[in-house]
Design a protein with these regions (language model features):
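Short, exposed beta-strand "edge-strand" segments with a Pro/Gly-rich flavor and a Y/T-containing core
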Residues: 1-12, 58-65, 98
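Extracytoplasmic cell-surface/polysaccharide-interacting catalytic and binding patches
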Residues: 1-52, 136, 141, 146-149
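Surface-exposed loop/turn and secondary-structure junction residues enriched for glycine/proline
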Residues: 16-18, 67, 72, 76, ...
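Generic detector of short, locally flexible boundary/turn motifs and exposed helical patches
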Residues: 22-27, 56-61, 96-99
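N-terminal start-of-chain detector that recognizes signal peptides
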Residues: 30-33, 62-69, 102-106
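Amphipathic alpha-helical interface surfaces
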Residues: 38, 42-45, 69, 91, ...
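Extended, low-complexity, intrinsically disordered C-terminal regulatory tails
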Residues: 44-77
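Catalytic cores and adjacent binding grooves of peptidoglycan-active enzymes
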Residues: 82-149
Length: 149
């Protein structure tokens, strides 16, 4: 049971202490001031995705990350870290769905957007997960494919 929506809780979107300590941070909670304006709309979109995928569990791989954390990761040589990520603004999630390939999750998110059932600003697919964000966006949804070929 979630405290934001039926299946998602604020804790899932916090930076876990185990990851934070790796780069000299303590566990980082999702900012309270963004819960209603950012996290709740994101979780509502994830609920629609979950329902479309037959109620399968949507696992949050990464939610909110402070910019300083990602900059520390970049300084340590980590690849694939954006200095301007929507994660810094509490508007993004990287996720996996048990039993569903990331390419299918990606296609399903885009289908839901096309049908007008969810509103997102960006969707990207990677080998192991899908990124979904609710960036402010008046134009078309930003999409990308970062899978290895």
């Amino acid at each position: 049971m979630g405290d934001i929506t039926a299946n998602f809780s604020r804790d899932e979107f916090a930076l876990p202490a185990s990851k934070a300590l790796e780069y000299g941070f303590r566990g980082v909670e999702y900012p309270e001031e963004w819960v209603e304006s950012r996290l709740r709309p994101l979780c509502r979109a994830l609920e629609v995705l979950r329902d479309k995928l037959g109620g399968r569990r949507v696992r949050v791989i990464s939610g909110y990350r402070p910019k300083a954390y990602d900059l520390a990761r970049l300084a340590a040589g980590r690849r694939g870290v954006s200095p301007n990520s929507q994660h810094h603004e509490g508007r993004a999630v990287d996720l996996q769905v048990r039993g569903v390939e990331p390419a299918q999750v990606y296609a399903t998110v885009l289908e839901l957007v096309e049908q007008g059932l969810i509103k997102v600003g960006g969707v990207g697919v990677y080998d192991e997960f899908v990124h979904v964000d609710i960036r402010p966006n008046e134009g078309p949804v930003k999409t990308w494919d970062e899978r290895s070929r």
